[in-house]
Amino acid sequence: TMTNSCEKGRSMIEMLGVLAIVGVLSVGGIAGYSKAMGKYKTNHLIEQLTMLITNIRNSFIGQHDFSDINNNLLINIGAVPADMYDHSRASNDILHAWNGKVTIFPSEASNNKQMAFELYVNNISKNVCIEMVTMDWGKDPSSGFTSLYIGTLEEDIAEPQMKDVHSSADRNEANGIYTIGTHDMAIPLTLEQAYAACTCSPVGCTIGL
């Protein structure tokens, strides 16, 4: 009888050990899945923005006036990727992979002439913000990319934020604006600079390209 009791005791301990291991594996599996999904969404967001920007440039090729550009126009001419806009909705909201809004404005960054456009992405996390602002979106002048905005606006972007940029040599990081060039805060930012710049509010960061 004593032998049987001891055997039962060891069996219970072994079972608890197995359950603990299964629990650890389950938590690890969930964490790994969440990380993988986060990476997938971020990559998809970058793909969406790249496609949208390419479509805008192709639609306005040969033109130097973006004064009429807005979400409605881009939706109507089919420049918005299919997975960023739901035609069954009445709104003109363009949504990205993290379910935040994308808003496009004509840019007043070049001597008040609207010869460019600004694209804003809201409701992204600090980690996504860091990944985006450390990317090389195009340092070559031929790319058309001149500046980057990093903010923590909790409301929808209602107007372009990069009005203070008049040339690629300007430095306006105090206003959340970063430019290409050879200065210390030139974009793309370093990892350390990005970590300091992406100070997100609870609803997330806002990025402007």
Briefly describe each language-model feature range.
Residues 2-41, 45-48:
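N-terminal single-pass transmembrane signal-anchor helix
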Residues 10-19, 82-98:
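Phosphate-binding glycine-rich loops and adjacent basic patches that engage nucleotide phosphates
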Residues 31-71:
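Membrane-proximal N-terminal amphipathic helix
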Residues 59-92:
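Short, glycine/small-hydrophobic-rich surface segments
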Residues 89-209:
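Intrinsically disordered, low-complexity regions enriched in Pro/Ser/Thr/Gly and acidic residues
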